[in-house]
Amino acid sequence: MPSWDGQVRPIGDGSTSDSGPQPGQVPGEKLAPGQKPPQFVVFSWDGALENDDHLFSRFRRVARENNAQMTFFLTSIYLVPNAKRQLYHPPQHAPGEAAISFPTDDHLKETLHEVGEAWRDGHEIGTHFNGHFCEAKGGGEWSVDEWRSEIEQAYSFVANWKTNTGYKDLPPLPFDFRKELAGGRAPCLEGQKNLLAAAKGYGWRYDASSPGEFQVWPGRKDGIWNFPLQLLPYPGRPVQVLSMDFNFLANQSGDSTEGDPRKYAGWLKETRDGYLNGFERVYNGSRAPLFIGNHFETWNGGIYMQAVEDVMKSVCRRDGVRCVSFRQLADWLDAQDPKVLERLRQLDPAQSPDWASFLK
């Protein structure tokens, strides 16, 4: 790679910039024969708005304290002022429509700051696309061309926030989003088939939109790494639960994000134990990467955020564990012998082989 000369170069209208290689990145290393694989854990965040709850800044701090890097799937309309919402032309919907709120001006500025600092901390900025449309007329019903339009707008709102907001005095984001963006997660995990067909043209390396699979080593779909939410053992029940805050919520208080406060402590333990069950199963077993998905939310008194913080503190500094971003995991997988990955994919989650002979 050419060495960086230390000059920050603005791109386009100055919304983004080339500020050199991202800090904190290490190249993927090939496993040696007989070597036990690292235990990768990927924490990811859908939306990534910094609002009055200050969860983006909180989890940047937690990550820093626990040697973790993560993936933030930015919803690009969080960089579009409400007054300019007509700039968004969603597939199958009227201009300016969205299933989520556009940001306040203060939240937009705070989100810009957090996104820039997250990148400098070594975290990945992925995409959660724009309007968060689900079900009828949502991503699951979009054509390949409609997904392309959604992707192009996701790029554009990040690359042109200065023009769209008029905030010319704020510093640029420290990365080129066209080069930075390596994958995303579709709202409601809908539409992966056509999304993948669209994503290929952008050189994306992974997709995290699968509606859920077992805790096994990842493979590729259409040449793109498939990083699904995973089924984890639910504490005290003979069922499994998808590895995301929303799915624990659905099992605990159903449709309500404000359930019975008397149950919060028990639900917090249940959620934390659910994530840790999934971790222990593979840490002591197949070493398949663990994927935990979240939103910045305060459901049921904030218990899901506390559960994730507790899990990060519990696992990220353990021996052999690497809490990484999805792109960092893709780097590592790309560095491996495909035959080795094929062998790893044969393992059940709790199956712990004799590594010295299994990967010789």
Residue ranges and their predicted role:
Residues 1-17:
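Short glycine- and acidic-rich boundary segments immediately preceding or forming the N-terminal edge
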Residues 147-152, 158-169, 173:
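Short N-terminal edge-element motif at the start of the domain
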Residues 136-154:
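Active-site cleft segment of glycoside hydrolase catalytic domains centered on the general acid/base Glu
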Residues 12-14, 18-124, 131-135, 164-197, ...:
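Active-site beta->alpha N-cap acidic-glycine motif
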Residues 4, 12, 89-105, 170-286, ...:
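Active-site-adjacent pocket scaffolds in enzyme catalytic domains
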Residues 52, 56, 111, 147, ...:
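Aromatic/hydrophobic pocket-lining residues that form the small-molecule binding cavity
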Residues 313, 318-360:
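Active-site and substrate-binding clefts of carbohydrate-active enzymes
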Residues 123, 127-128, 227-230:
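Aromatic- and acid-rich polysaccharide-binding/catalytic face
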